Amino acid sequence: MIYISPKLVVALPVKELKDLNRIELLINDVDLVELRLDYLSKFDVDILDLFSKYKEKLIITLRDKDEGGVNYIDPAFKANFVRRMEREKFMYDIEARFALRYQVNVKDKIVSIHYFDNLPEFTEVKEIFDKFDEAYLRKIAVIAKRGYRELLMRVLDNYDNAVVMPMGVNGVERIAFSLLGSKLIYAHAGEETAKGQLHYKDVRRILNQLSTIMSSPST
């Protein structure tokens, strides 16, 4: 196995504006902070001004409810919000289905698909992913049903910019997939935003230990 160092992302559920104060506490501990704005019951586009100074280390996510989001977000508002983020050069994570329907820009952004109930065939994943060659990363999260490991490994074998995540499994599996080529590993800072996330401090410690082992001279 070739050891590949993924970027560590801490997912931060933003339920109140005061939760944004945690950004400054986290950005020096991890590579990126994901702001899950769909946890807010209401906000407007000007919320971007509150954390624009951190944009180089942020991923902004407004997840649709049918793809794992918490609160309903009006699609027209979301499309406008995403275009504002594009203009202001924020990194964002957008669902493939939404990106196609509303023709939002995905160049150098993260495009994602989620399967909570069924495991897709690889051909279905490929058909979707191949529409987003300009994306920075192509991400897939799947329920841990029979065959999910084989599916996710095939995605990694076919896409150099893939992020793969099994849901509802031991968090160590997420680390394993990141070592096999998944570009990001998501963790939490006290509250999971997806089943199977480990605390970011545990992930960081494990990755550091593996890095030390792999960089040590063979005996």
UniProtKB/Swiss-Prot annotation:
3-dehydroquinate binds at residues 34-36, 63, 174, 193, 197. The active site is at residues 114, 139. Pfam families: DHquinase_I. The keyword Amino-acid biosynthesis applies. The keyword Lyase applies. It catalyses: 3-dehydroquinate = 3-dehydroshikimate + H2O. Transmembrane segments: none annotated. PANTHER family: 3-DEHYDROQUINATE DEHYDRATASE. Homodimer. This is 3-dehydroquinate dehydratase. The gene is aroD.
